[in-house]
Amino acid sequence: MLWLMTMGRRLNGVYAAFMLVAFMMGIAGALQAPTLSLFLSREVGAQPFWVGLFYTVNAIAGILVSLALAKRSDSRGDRRRLIMFCCLMAVGNALLFAFNRHYLTLITCGVMLASVANAAMPQLFALAREYADSSAREVVMFSSIMRAQLSLAWVIGPPLAFMLALNYGFTTMFSIAAGIFVISLALIAFKLPSVARVEQPSEGAEVLVQAGGWHDKNVRMLFIASTLMWTCNTMYIIDMPLWISSDLGLPDSLAGILMGTAAGLEIPAMILAGYYVKRWGKRNMMVTAVAAGVLFY
């Protein structure tokens, strides 16, 4: 009971707003991402090469825009206003996909809107960390709870996405995603705080830290390994819905159920990994995870 009362005091007010926004933005994102390849192939009529090109352009644009926005938000400006702007772009992106079926428009305007919109979630976590630091709260615990909200959103989002897309159409699904982003925007505007900017390290020191890190062989190997692992996972998310429906002839909705189930299993897996990492070691944990991926694929 004491634990529940303590958590209640920690998670009221602004903290509850942070978790609700993370959950709702996660739901909106989970409505769009799992069905995108199906949308491009069936609704837009894009061939496999053009579907892959869309993801490539989207990824490159997302990296460039996210880096630019992160650099700006870390140095100056109100992070909350930036999140609101990203949510506004997310609304525009969802409405564009809801009512447009022209490939060239989607790969240009849609990708640019999505690149800005995708920066909302990392900026939200950064704002939450800054607020937790400024209010002398437990940052690690609060961040973990917020990440759990995101995982929970991916348990619900993919099955809901395929249900809406297959039964009511992609226009309805994207419109609902836009509505969720509008609600998130309102919560951010009226419930989340602005946090005073903390003085940043000098530019010279930052350059030295970045250079020293990249010159470390272990850092480079970790970067390459992470890139390869994320490449495999991204290929799976893109191709799995099409593989289930086209090659296996199974119901399209099964893809959403599989993604949601995987996200649900991910929550206890992350908790167990955090518990056993001190006993097994981070390196052994990573090797085990990669071996599991090899067996899966």
Language-model-derived ranges and their functions:
Residues 53-62, 146, 150, 257-266:
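Transmembrane alpha-helical segments of major facilitator superfamily
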Residues 64-78, 165, 269-282:
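Helix-to-loop junctions at the C-terminal end of transmembrane segments
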